Amino acid sequence: LAPKAILYTQGQVFHIDALLKRQEFQISTSEPHCTVLKNEGGPNAAFLLDFGMEFAGGIRLAVETCTGEATPVLRLRFGESVGEAMSDVGQNGSSNDHSPRDFEVKTTSFSDLEFGQTGFRFVRIDLLSPKTSVRLKAVTGVFTYRNIEYKGSFRCSDPLLNTIYDVAAYTCHLNMQHMLWDGKPFACRRGIPGKNLCSSCFLHCLRVPGVIT
């Protein structure tokens, strides 16, 4: 999945719009369209991506070159909301329970690596290494999607009700990526059964003869 929008930048971040363009992941020695993160005093370079929808999975980073530190440290923060992606662990209820959503990773030149296994829509990336720059070719979402046959459907004359039904069905589907009702790993996996209950109750209440088949 390609990011849909850049919501925030901090420090020295150049050519950030390059991350919104679809590119091949094959990395060459002279990529013409890269986003550059540079730390040379002042706030660390950082940005916040919006993928436009919530999904289960992680992100894939394609790095062209790094200068300064050979294996720069990046901080990744995943969130179902902007507030969560911008929060530290312990702030506003954010946590790393069950599946880390806030952690540090190392990268290197000419690398193509995947990180994260959680539920999110937004991700913030910070360059932590001082006196270092990183040229990012691409950041994409890696969608973990179990192929499940939908047994029912619902459509009516109210577009809003149709949307509510679709969101409820999609929520149930996201929470079935591993064992049945096991849920996508995210900040608080224990909250998953509650989400499933709301979605499944809604679907059950709409089970009107001739409407859901």
Give residue spans per PLM region.
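Extracellular/oxidizing-compartment recognition motifs
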Residues: 1-185, 195, 211-213
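An alpha-helical repeat/solenoid feature that recognizes helix-turn-helix modules
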Residues: 192-198
